[in-house]
């Protein structure tokens, strides 16, 4: 869903004219999706009048959920950025690889928070390590030649 939103919102447009753009469009789509998902998550307790649960659960949810969506979408964006000036076949392979890795990251996050006794803070630390890697790749992608030859 996030990839479709990013494709409609920017990836398929003429404005997507340099490698960094794919990361920006996908991260933007992830933030929008996470905001919508978090809002829906909060409506249940709020409708039941349980404001305290909504605030406490919402804080943890916003931290983990938003960052894991950014991490998984940025992963796809990184693969797209490195395939920017490559042939169409390589772009398709790159998107597929990025989607599979992003799905794996999100699935691992879901398994860890739902089915293990690992503390939220340990899981959150792993997500932050991934976000730091995204920032490193962001800087590396900025150095790529934006013009295809």
Task: Annotate each PLM feature.
Residues 1-149:
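Hydrophobic alpha-helical segments at protein termini of multi-pass membrane proteins
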């Amino acid at each position: 869903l996030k990839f479709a939103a990013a494709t409609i919102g920017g990836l398929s447009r003429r404005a997507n004219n340099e490698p960094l753009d794919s990361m920006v469009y996908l991260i933007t789509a992830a933030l929008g999706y996470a905001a919508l998902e978090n809002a829906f998550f909060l409506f249940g307790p709020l409708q039941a009048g349980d404001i305290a649960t909504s605030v406490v659960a919402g804080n943890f949810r916003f931290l983990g959920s938003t960052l894991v969506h950014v991490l998984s979408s940025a992963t796809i964006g990184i693969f797209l950025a490195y395939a920017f000036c490559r042939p169409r076949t390589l772009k398709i392979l790159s998107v597929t690889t990025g989607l599979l890795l992003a799905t794996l990251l999100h699935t691992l996050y879901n398994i860890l928070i739902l089915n293990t006794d690992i503390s939220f803070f340990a899981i959150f630390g792993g997500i932050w390590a991934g976000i730091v890697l995204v920032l490193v790749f962001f800087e590396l992608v900025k150095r790529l030649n934006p013009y295809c030859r």
